[in-house]
Curated annotation (Swiss-Prot):
It is an enzyme of class 2 (transferase). The keyword Methyltransferase does not apply. This is Rhamnulokinase. GO terms for cellular component: cytosol. Substrate binds at residues 83, 236-238, 296. GO terms for molecular function: ATP binding; glycerol kinase activity; rhamnulokinase activity. Pathway: Carbohydrate degradation; L-rhamnose degradation; glycerone phosphate from L-rhamnose: step 2/3. Monomer. The gene is rhaB.
Amino acid sequence: MTFRNCVAVDLGASSGRVMLARYERECRSLTLREIHRFNNGLHSQNGYVTWNVDSLESAIRLGLNKVCEEGIRIDSIGIDTWGVDFVLLDQQGQRVGLPVAYRDSRTNGLMAQAQQQLGKRDIYQRSGIQFLPFNTIYQLRALTEQQPELIPHIAHALLIPDYFSYRLTGKMNWEYTNATTTQLVNINSDDWDESLLAWSGANKAWFGRPTHPGNVIGHWICPQGNEIPVVAVASHDTASAVIASPLNGSRAAYLSSGTWSLMGFESQTPFTNDTALAANITNEGGAEGRYRVLKNIMGLWLLQRVLQERQINDLPALIAATQALPACRFIINPNDDRFINPDEMCSEIQAACRETAQPIPESDAELARCIFDSLALLYADVLHELAQLRGEDFSQLHIVGGGCQNTLLNQLCADACGIRVIAGPVEASTLGNIGIQLMTLDELNNVDDFRQVVSTTANLTTFTPNPDSEIAHYVAQIHSTRQTKELCA
């Protein structure tokens, strides 16, 4: 029996994990084992919202060392993380400034400024990327305007997964799928767009040309002295999650559900027409030259903040209490900028309901019900937008990632969208990370080949839409999910 042992480092906005995958070639069997799980979160430092990258690096190394201590031969390592954020380095490879997080307010007003100065349509035609106030282009503009004293010291700008790969190998890389999230990559050339870079204030010399997933960046030397290849996987966690989504046919959509919810479909060509621009659709890079045509939805970030503020530890009990409440009494727009990082999420949700003359969610369960119903309705709205964009309805929706364990939200999504939902795999980003490693090791042919492995080994659950549910009646009552957006705008 031939085995491959691959390690995936998967960092999310709220937690990180080091996972060991064991692939058996003859039976095409893939098993995962968690080696080390650790917390991640936002920190306040010198007036900025930041990431503790030193703590994350220590946790990554701890996890890798644990594998080596077990005497396991590691064939390769891959790292995926969230997008848009970066670390600046000087000529000696030392950090310049702070690793500021995308939820920091330093970019306020800069997106509108860019649209006014460069033209919204021109930016979109160049990048194909949706307008989000924290995109890297606006973060760099904020840095170069607000901290010009740092500029002479900057030699390199590395996105978060590339930074950790650099820390392991000493080699720099700019991986394509994550680079596209910056809104700085030209959609036609797959290279940095000089006009957009110039507006950001960044120097093109800070960046190397983006490379597609599947190349070996360098090697990590383990404590035992072995050199282990570090592979450039699809380093944006959503790109990895999509690779592991067992999409079957052209009418399948995906929803990567976690702190963020990313809903979309795969395409061989980008969508940058006026309809896509009006809907704020993004065309992020995927594996094998595919585009991830999708839209960002605020996701379970709202719930995470409520759990934190109300000090709720028993999530299953909360979901059970939530399920007992009537649907659609409290509806908000989860994508409103007011929910990006408010001082108090509970108060912000209540204020949004008050301002739209709705009942006010007071209890823990009412707040959760508000979030779940609002997300499900927004999912339906976005799915409708995506279907209109491509001119064809979807037949099924694959929900992957940690959020797919929320059976209540899965069923609400199926009911609101009127579509069959297939939930799983939970560790989609990790699996997609492993998939690219196995392709790089010549164990698998391509993404479709890997998806067959996922389909046969992952635990998948199907949710059938119930047209008689409260949320389905709510959607039918307003006749079109497009109106939902207006109701909660």
